[in-house]
Every structure is written in C-alpha cells, then in structure tokens.
Amino acid sequence: MAGHSKFKNIMHRKGRADAARSKLFSKLSREITVAAKTGLPDPAMNPRLRLAVNNAKAESLPKDVIERAIKKSQMGDAADYSEIRYEGVAAGGVGIIVEVLTDNKNRAAANVRSYFTKMGGNMGATGSVTFNFDRVGQISYPAKAASEDDMMEAAIEAGADDVTSDMDEEGEGHTVYTAFESLNDVAAALEAKFGAASNTKIAWRPKMQVPVTGDAVATLMKLLDMLDEDDDVQAVYSNEDISDEDLAKLG
C-alpha cells in the first residue's frame, strides 16, 4: 500500500515477498471493513468500498476474504478504527506523509514517531509536509494495458489532469492523475476501455522532489521500509528523487 514514488525505488525491497503479501492482504481487508462500516456494505452504493474491493481484487485477495471483511463491518464487536495522518521529515529534508488505520491511536503514534527518530528524522505538525503535496485521484495500469499515446488520449477524454508512463520492462506502467472529486468517473471511463486498473486511490502527489544521494539513500529507504511494514500503516507518500545509480548500490 506504499505510495512513495517510482516503482524502481522499491524494487530492492522485494526480498520478504511472502511476509509482505500477508501484510498487504491484512491491510486490504482492514480498508474493506472500514469502508463498509462507514457507509453501506454494498460496493455498488458505496464508492469507497467499491475502490477498496477493486484494489483487493487487483492484488488477488480471495473472494471469500473480501466477503468476510465486508460482513465483519456489520458485526457488533467489530473493532473501531481511527484514520490518522502523520507528517514528518526524514534526514536530508524528504517530506513523508503516513496514513494510518488503527484500533490503538497511542500505539500507532508511538511507533511512527520512533521510526522517524531512529532514522534521524522528525515528526511534524499537521500541514508541515502536506503543503508540498497535492491531494489527487490516482489510477494505475500496467504498461501492457495500452500504448502511451492511447492511455494519454483516453485519460484526457475521461477528464484526467495528467498521465505519466514508464514503459520499461520493470517500470511502473501508466499512472493517471485526476482531481480527487473526479476519481470515480475517470476510473469508470478508463475501465470501460482498458479493463480494471491495478490500483485506484486518493493519493498525495509531490509538487517537487528532494534529491537524495550517498549514504542518505539507505537511511531513507530503511525508514520507508519500517513505516511500510507497520501493521497500522495503510499508505506512505514521500518526495525523494534518487538516481538509478544510487538505487543500484543498495543491492
């Protein structure tokens, strides 16, 4: 569920695939439960739940797990989750936004703060980082879904604001950005043309990126790892700019 930029920036962090997959499934299930609890338990009538279910399907979350997560929202003993946003700055000046979904606010705050402190960063006040980001709708497709020109044309026709395409073999494919109010309409138009997206969400897009080089790269990536791996953390957004050469040194 991490949101920090460029697929290549996280390729070196794929070693713990099974554990990461288990955590991802847990986070997807939690989002489904919360979405169903805050609205109707019917994806057709609940836009947030529809997005959560579609994203879960794109990640191959089993159908029975999705159904259980929805049913859980209707149980009287279902946990009460709080949605919290933390903001902080890593060593080197990289801004980080951490979105949390937790049943224990004190635990979540203490953990996130400890990660920043341990890696030489600092937690900030609300708004201390988000002013460097735009709140947008984000729709992702693999490169094979369409050519760069076809995706651009379809996205513009659907009302999107911007499209980036990374068509390399290990690239991140197509990312379509919209006003967050238009996300569902644009996503529906693209799905009609290209099929289901690999991910659709409200995201934080950096207005500018901060160059990170040398030893600071490993420190930053360790911090992002720690945040990603926390069970309470649903998404992480950051505005680093790291060269392919520095990423390659991480192994």
From Swiss-Prot:
One of its GO terms (cellular component) is cytosol. GO terms for biological process: regulation of DNA-templated transcription. It is found in: Cytoplasm. One of its GO terms (molecular function) is DNA binding. Pfam families: TACO1_YebC_N, Transcrip_reg. Keywords: Cytoplasm, DNA-binding, Transcription, Transcription regulation. InterPro entries: Integrase-like_N, TACO1_YebC-like_2nd/3rd_dom, TACO1_YebC_N, Transcrip_reg_TACO1-like, Transcrip_reg_TACO1-like_dom3, YebC-like. SUPFAM superfamilies: YebC-like. Belongs to the TACO1 family. This is Probable transcriptional regulatory protein CCNA_03352. It comes from Caulobacter vibrioides (strain NA1000 / CB15N). The lineage of its organism: Bacteria, Pseudomonadati, Pseudomonadota, Alphaproteobacteria, Caulobacterales.
